[in-house]
Amino acid sequence: DNVIPSANSMAARFFLELGHACGQTQWIDRAEAMAQAMHERVKTDPFWHSGWVLLFEHLARPVPVLKYGASARAKAMEIWREAPLSPLLVPENSIEPDQMMLCIGTQCLMAEAEKARILEALSE
């Protein structure tokens, strides 16, 4: 798997990020299983497995996902520009139109309309 970046590590990262964005735990589980299968190789020779090292970093610190209702897109974009760690923005029909919901990993905070509260949660 010496190709930089390896197709397998990119696929695993895709499963992980898509799983977080869509709330599909089976995709997250798939990424974790792929990472586990490579763990010993990465530990032994991390320089030859940089794509996998990045995946392990994303497993340890997932990218925040900000889900937003139909009329909250502008606020979500402001948060994306202002946050210390820019979240992945995902439109979400299951929350109120003016609400936003911050998710990190598989944990989501209560839906919120206030931009300041979301920014505060992102900076913690």
PLM-predicted stretches and their roles:
Residues 1-124:
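Glycan-recognition and catalytic cores of secretory/periplasmic carbohydrate-active enzymes
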